[in-house]
Amino acid sequence: MARYIFITGGVVSSLGKGLASAALGALLQARGYTVRLRKLDPYLNIDPGTMSPYQHGEVFVTDDGAETDLDLGHYERFTGRPAVRDDNITTGRIYRDIIAKERRGDYLGATVQVVPHVTNAIKEFILTGNEGLDFVLVEIGGTVGDIEGLPFFEAIRQLGNELPRGHAIYIHLTLLPYIPSAGELKTKPTQHSVKELRSIGIQPHILLCRTDRPIPFEERRKLGLFCNVRENAVIEARDVSSIYDVPHAYHAAGLDQEVLSAFGIEPAPKPDMSRWKAVMERIDNPEGEVTIAIVGKYTGLKDAYKSLIEALSHGGIANRVRVNLDWIESEIFEGTDPAPHLEHVHGILVPGGFGQRGAEGKMLAARFARQRKVPFFGICFGMQMAVIEAVRSLADIPLANSTEFGPTNEPVVGLMTEWMRDNELQMRAAEGDLGGTMRLGAYPALLAAGSKIAEIYGATEISERHRHRYEVNTAYREQLAEKGMIFSGLSPDGLLPEVVEFQDHPWFIGVQYHPELKSRPFAPHPLFSSFIAAAMEQSRLV
């Protein structure tokens, strides 16, 4: 039977519970255990698919088409285990399912309440689908004391009593702030956070304390005494230079050993940290550096591009170079020459996005890369803008546009209304709901033999994750091919363009899918490895 590790947070939000969960999962894997990581999000949205990137950050898409929390990206990158729809649930999804059951009469006239109906639904979600696993790590979003999180805390409290003895532990991630004027770390916020947690019936087994400096013995002793945990269970989670050093840092601090001790697993098998050491060796000893411009719409919140940032770093790991990112808001290009902002960079990446704001700036970035022969990588919306720019400039159709921005007589990009998934026709209406109605998840694509994209993949059949409701119009295919831009990747039915590239350019590729979602530090995505390699070549010319 699986053992359960519940990870909660306190004092402040954005402490890194997702990263801590992922790192612990990686450490348990390194000891030979099988793990699954799951996330409970207390917000009332069904999923984060319609939430602003400025509020939620990135929407991480799974192979099975779920729009989930960005922490699932950490889980995948650290453990290599693909996440699925049922690794993430929200209060909104739970309430929707409960209300649907109530309307059907499934509760036989009972008064539907938070306890037991909501808490039972949460417990059922946590316990389902874990057969054959050694450990299930469950992260609870938000911080202890949040009103919306109370049903989740109550559910995991009940599970602590209902699971067999020795099959559930609680880890509380907290912050030890340093007060310069006092010259010391303060433990009182953590004490109050644990007091709040204990008031709802949860006694943490381990305190994982975020800090920028070593925890003195006296503070460690004080935390153990007033938080009712053993001193050895007060784990120092020191800041590190790279997130990929977190597994090693947590192992050195004794987190994985303390977790196994809390479960009574002795002696514990030694972890194999070789692949993490290999990754850090490349990060710590770069043989060069490149600068990549990210021309985006949500650059004010870097979490909106979390997987993209990590995938670029993976490309750097593969090529033994440091990747410096130059964040550029695409709107600043509109009506101006982008050259002063882009002449110094070695590669230009235009990521996904929605809506007309900043679209013209993205097209100008694509034009600059095309004309100056700078490596260009367009992803999803970025590919669409590159195609529109090519139709306007090369095919001499200045009114070319996307129907996403309004009616147009030259719809180079249009709304998808029909596509195939698993041999079934999927249909969407233009006036339908926005949530969950895009082309989501893994879809196959066929690559043209002899194309640059096929050379990069080393294959002509691939599967990648998608998140879009607009597509490039194949009616412009021949006109673009005459100008050097080819559709080098298509859906199996030949109707949906998946990849475009310029044949006479050192590296100009646009993809409709999101390759960043499948990149790993120890298995960099080939597109990002190739893009960074092209940027290295460009760095020798600039």
Curated annotation (Swiss-Prot):
Entry GO MF terms: ATP binding; CTP synthase activity; glutaminase activity; identical protein binding; metal ion binding
GO BP: 'de novo' CTP biosynthetic process; pyrimidine nucleobase biosynthetic process
Enzyme Commission code(s) on record: 6.3.4.2
UniProt enzyme class: ligase
The keyword Metal-binding is assigned to this record: yes
List of residues binding Mg(2+): 71, 139
Stretches the record annotates as Amidoligase domain: 1-265
Entry coiled-coil feature ranges: none
Activity modulation notes: Allosterically activated by GTP, when glutamine is the substrate; GTP has no effect on the reaction when ammonia is the substrate. The allosteric effector GTP functions by stabilizing the protein conformation that binds the tetrahedral intermediate(s) formed during glutamine hydrolysis. Inhibited by the product CTP, via allosteric rather than competitive inhibition.
Positions that bind UTP: 13, 186-191, 222
Residues holding CTP: 13, 146-148, 186-191, 222
Residues engaged in binding L-glutamine: 54, 353, 381-384, 404, 469
Function: Catalyzes the ATP-dependent amination of UTP to CTP with either L-glutamine or ammonia as the source of nitrogen. Regulates intracellular CTP levels through interactions with the four ribonucleotide triphosphates.
Membership in a protein family: Belongs to the CTP synthase family.
Name the record gives this protein: CTP synthase
UniProt organism field: Beijerinckia indica subsp. indica (strain ATCC 9039 / DSM 1715 / NCIMB 8712)
